[in-house]
Every structure is written in C-alpha cells, then in structure tokens.
Swiss-Prot record:
Protein name as annotated: Mannitol-1-phosphate 5-dehydrogenase
Function: Catalyzes the NAD(H)-dependent interconversion of D-fructose 6-phosphate and D-mannitol 1-phosphate in the mannitol metabolic pathway. Has a strong preference for NADH over NADPH.
Binding site for NAD(+): A5, I6, Q7, F8, G9, G10, G11, N12, I13, G14, R15, G16
GO BP terms: mannitol catabolic process; mannitol metabolic process
Length: 388
C-alpha cells in the first residue's frame, strides 16, 4: 500500500501548501471539508495547478493522486480513512480545530496499525497541534487515553507561506509565493521516526521558530495591512511602497527582534537578515496580496498570545520598548466594519458598547496588573473617542 495523508481543509493553504508537499513526498492526499462546493470540485477534477510566484517569474506544478470526502455527510468514511492513514494534517483556522477533533478522535480510536498516525496541525497559532490534541482527548474515552500514543503522535509545526486572494475564476488552482517554511518538532515520534516529507524542516525545539515567525511575519504583515488600510492602500506591496509605512513596519520589527534575540539563541544578525527577507517577500507586487485579506479577523489578531499583544506583553514584562507595537494595536482597533469581515463589525460593536476598561479585558485578555494593560487601555480610549 502507498502512503496516505488526510488533509482537513480544502482551502487555498490546504491545496496550495500542505497538499503540494504531501503530493511531492509521494502521499495520496484525502481532502476532508464541509464545504460542498470545494468537495464537489475536488471530486470532479483529477488534477489542479499550484503556481509559485516570485520576482524571477512563475513556476506551475500539477497536483494529482487525491480524493475528497465531505465530513458533514460522510463521517464514517472519514473515520475509516484516518484508521489506515500515515499522516493527518489540517489547515482550517485555529477556531475550527474543536469542530474537526471529534471525527479525528474516532479515527484514531479505530486504528489497529502497529505504527501510530502522525498528527500535524498547520495553523497560524502557537501550539496548534497541542490545542487540537486537547480537543481530541476530550472526545476520547478516558480508558483509552493512556494508550493513545500507540495510535497517534502529535507534533506542533510552524508554517510560513503567503497565499494571496485568488483570481475569481481560479477554481481549484492556487497562486502562492515561492518562498515557504514548514518546521515541525521531531521528538514526539520517538522510536517510530518522523514521516518522510522532504519539505519539512524537522527540529527538536520548535518554540524559537514559531515565535520568530509569528512575531516577525505575522506581526509585520498585519501591521502593513492595518496602516495600509487607514491610508487607502489596496495591496500590501502598495502599502510598503509608502516610505512612512515601511519605516513604521521596520520599527515594529526592531522591537519584536529585540524580544526574539533576547529569548532565543538567534543572533541579531540572523534576525536582521530574516526581517529583510520578510519585508522583501511582502513587497513582492507579483503576489497581489490584498490589504483587507491580511487585516481580516482583527479580534483574533488582537488576542492575548497573538502577533501584537503577545510580543508587546513580553517586552513590557522585560522593561523593553513596545511603543511601535502600540501603534499596530491602534491601527488594528481602527479596522472596523470592513465589508465581508464579521470580526471587524464585532470589533466596532465592542468598542461602541463597552467602556475602555471592559474592552481591554474582552479584546486582549490582559490582566489589570500587567504592565501592558494601562497603555493598551489608553489606546482603546483614544480610538473610542475618535469614533464618537
């Protein structure tokens, strides 16, 4: 039997990042989704194209050898597939992990193979696989928990690849940047060894990679989007062509760099080179990366361990400067009532109906005694005053 991977989420990242590399590693990919349109398209199309875009031009790869199942209507089939799979991955968004966990729990419980399945969540969130594992354990019989490691091994990952908005007639085809990083911890696999996926960079300690990525790529990307949105820019590359926005982004990333080099064994030179690479990637006009796409879901992006409050809170605890990040937080708070983005409407409602104190707790999860609490509360009060 050939190798088989189950990929939850048939969206752009699922098809254009995860499945591309699983396919190249020789896996049959079984897509799982609840969106009829995506499943029907995958079932009726034997191949699709992934086009990697860079300043050097474009390179197109054809993806084949996949199937698709709708977990909403065919849950038992999904359970059977997980029962005989080598790998389970997902790219569904951190908020959806709790919804896919019950069927994964059933699939893991049904396994009889001697080698455990590798479970790797590919989400923009710290410890996403741990989060998924927690939900899976909640959906597993207590007397089966102690032996679960015989049936599944869970590894956290850090993913990095820009997937812009796709052309309206793209169908299953995905345009994606050429650059990527997919880093996964290898220690959970123990004596079984990690899956054979050449695109993955396997490491013993993932935390430095996750924090460096989240607090550089995601912080920089979102900062560019929110400042760009306030200035009426349509594309990320247009926003970074504005010298003032570019300077602000560099200032923000200087502050997060200080945190990263202080905490982890990453030198200032390594981090500076990483920042330059990231800003260059985001400035790529060929990606046609939309400001509103990058800015969407501001509530999640303003939460406690995310790209702004996460690094700013740690800097505040260390007595290091975080003023540039406060600027990003302010611009994120001003991303309100953007068409097609429910969270931006919810943000506007919270800021309108709550006091600055209530909104600070609700949006950021910061404790009142935290050194970042008062500065953020002041920014929230300022945004509320400007909105009146």
């Amino acid at each position: 039997m050939g190798k088989k991977a189950i990929q939850f989420g048939g969206g752009n990242i699922g098809r254009g990042f995860v499945a591309e590399f699983l396919h190249e590693a020789g896996y049959e990919v079984v897509f799982i989704d609840v969106v009829d349109k995506i499943i029907d398209a995958l079932k009726s199309t034997p191949s699709y194209e992934v086009t990697e875009v860079s300043e050097e031009g474009e390179k197109t790869k054809t993806i084949t050898n996949y199937r698709a199942i709708n977990s909403k209507t065919n849950e038992e089939d999904v359970v059977k597939e997980i029962g005989t799979a080598d790998v389970v991955t997902c790219a569904v968004g951190p908020n959806v992990l709790k919804f896919i966990a019950p069927v994964i729990a059933k699939g893991i419980d049904a396994r009889t193979a001697s080698k455990p399945v590798a479970v790797i969540a590919c989400e923009n969130a710290i410890g996403a696989t741990d989060t998924l594992r927690g939900f899976i354990e909640q959906n597993t019989d207590k007397d089966r928990l102690s032996s679960m490691s015989e049936r599944a091994r869970f590894a956290n990952s850090a993913i990095d690849r820009i997937v812009p908005n796709q052309p309206p007639n793209a169908g299953l085809n995905v345009r994606i940047e050429k650059f990527y990083e997919w880093t996964v911890e290898q220690t959970p696999f123990g004596e079984f060894g990690h899956p054979d996926i050449p695109a993955i960079h396997w490491v013993d300690d993932l935390k430095p990679y996750i924090e460096r990525k989240l607090f550089t790529v995601n912080t920089g990307h979102a900062t560019t989007a929110y400042y760009g949105h306030m200035r009426g820019k349509k594309m990320i590359a247009d926003a970074l062509a504005d010298a003032e926005i570019r300077q602000i982004v560099h200032k923000v990333l200087e502050q997060t760099a200080k945190l990263i080099t202080t905490k982890h064994e990453i030198t200032e030179q390594e981090q500076n080179e990483y920042v330059d690479t990231i800003v260059k990637r985001m400035s790529n006009p060929f990606l046609e990366d939309n400001v509103e796409r990058v800015g969407r879901a501001p509530l999640r992006k303003l939460s406690r361990n995310e790209r702004f409050i996460g690094p700013a809170s740690q800097l505040a605890e260390k007595g290091l400067p975080f003023d540039a990040l406060l600027g990003s937080i302010e611009m994120a708070l001003r991303f309100q009532n953007v068409p097609g983005d429910e969270e931006s409407a919810e943000l506007a409602k919270i800021l309108k109906e709550m006091s600055a104190e209530e909104a600070t707790g609700k949006l950021t999860g910061l404790e009142k005694h935290h050194p970042l609490y008062e500065p953020v509360q002041n920014v929230i009060a300022k945004v509320q005053k400007d909105s009146k």
